[in-house]
């Protein structure tokens, strides 16, 4: 992955308008410093890391805002004012770009 990032960063015209989203397809299990949601139809299970590499990101910043894989699609739709790109992004919850405060699914522990 670092090869791709280096290639883009070495092209100033491309880099100045780029955001690279790096995420994994699954979490690392139940060893987690944060809340681990129960896995159910509505529960999210373990957290999945995402790294954004861009000239627009703050150096050394860590953001704990709730997001999921669909959040990337929703970001693209909102940023470029596009219609929903897939059936999975038709809803507006959770939509980290429009929610204030922390989001926990309905199956969160009480």
Feature names for model-found ranges:
Residues 1-110:
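N-terminal pro-sequences and low-complexity stem/linker regions of secreted or lumenal proteins
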């Amino acid at each position: 992955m670092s090869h791709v990032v280096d290639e883009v960063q070495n092209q100033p015209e491309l880099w100045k308008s780029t955001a690279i989203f790096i995420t994994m397809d699954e979490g690392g299990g139940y060893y987690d410093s944060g809340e681990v949601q129960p896995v159910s139809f509505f529960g999210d299970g373990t957290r999945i890391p995402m790294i954004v590499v861009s000239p627009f990101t703050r150096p050394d910043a860590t953001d704990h805002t709730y997001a999921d894989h669909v959040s990337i699609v929703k970001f693209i739709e909102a940023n470029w004012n596009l219609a929903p790109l897939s059936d999975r992004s038709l809803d507006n919850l959770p939509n980290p770009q429009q929610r204030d405060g922390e989001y926990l699914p309905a199956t969160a522990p009480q």
